[in-house]
A protein has these predicted regions:
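Short beta->alpha connector loops at strand-helix junctions that form conserved
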Residues: 91-98, 216-217
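Short aromatic/basic micro-patch
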Residues: 24, 144, 183-184, 215, ...
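Acidic donor-binding segment of Leloir-type glycosyltransferases
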Residues: 42-91
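Conserved beta-loop-beta/alpha segment of the NTase-like Rossmann-fold superfamily
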Residues: 96-191
Length: 236
């Protein structure tokens, strides 16, 4: 099973007052927290690849371990990202259209690997091998989602998929019955995801197929919190 983890790091941060992805949460920029945990999981699971989608060139360069990066970026984590990038399992996708809504980021993440040009040197790869069997969407403004939860969710959904190969499962991390991110989609739903427009996200597709949805419950509600305002970050 080939699993593509699409890391959505392209939002406009309208309510935050500045680019929240670069806002420091603890000792790191917000976007790096979950990306580094996801990279650690991918290092252990060779079936995973990570596609980072952003409209911000600096973020994409840092994501793959290039450029000076933030001074707080631990060398071991930066090196891990660089090694994954060097092996073709972590790659950046420049998506200026993402400013028009999340559907553009979703589309860019799914189509990554197509031989399209990019204004950033070295940021376009021709994906080797077959297309992904699964797309899992992560959001970069969810800095408290743990590495353990990421790995457990992916293992849970691999088991679900393996038990019934005729089904087309969708998976969602939830807390107290409330769905959150990340969300797992069988490639069966690829065309529906590509058909999204504007600021409509993958939850729209999920809600159309609730009979196929498997929820993975976490105990800590904080893991699923995202940060939309400075008050969110300060209060959490």
């Amino acid at each position: 099973m080939k699993i593509r983890c699409v890391y959505l790091a392209a939002g406009n941060s309208r309510r935050f007052g500045k680019n929240k992805l670069f806002h420091m949460v603890g000792q790191k920029p917000m976007y790096l927290h979950l990306l580094d945990r996801l990279a650690a999981v991918a290092e252990r699971h060779k079936e995973l690849e990570i596609v980072v989608v952003s409209q911000y060139e600096e973020l994409l360069q840092e994501a793959v371990g290039e450029g000076p990066g933030p001074v707080c970026d631990p060398s071991v984590e930066k090196e891990r990202r660089a090694l994954l990038a060097g092996s073709g399992r972590l790659y950046p996708v420049y998506s200026p259209q993402s400013r028009e809504g999340v559907s553009h980021s979703i589309r860019a993440g799914i189509l990554a690997g197509m031989p399209e040009s990019s204004p950033i040197s070295g940021m376009c790869r021709q994906e080797a091998g077959r297309e992904p069997d699964v797309y899992v969407f992560f959001v970069a403004d969810q800095p408290w989602l743990s590495e353990r939860t990421v790995e457990a969710f992916l293992e849970f959904m691999k088991k679900v998929s393996g038990e019934d190969r005729e089904s087309h499962p969708i998976g969602c991390v939830s807390c107290l019955g409330e769905p959150g991110n990340p969300v797992w989609f069988s490639a069966f739903y690829k065309d529906e995801l590509l058909a999204l427009s504007g600021d409509r996200g993958g939850k729209r597709v999920m809600k159309a197929h609730m009979d196929q949805v498997h929820f993975f419950e976490v105990e800590e509600e904080r893991e699923l919190w995202d940060v939309d305002t400075l008050e969110d970050q300060a209060g959490r």
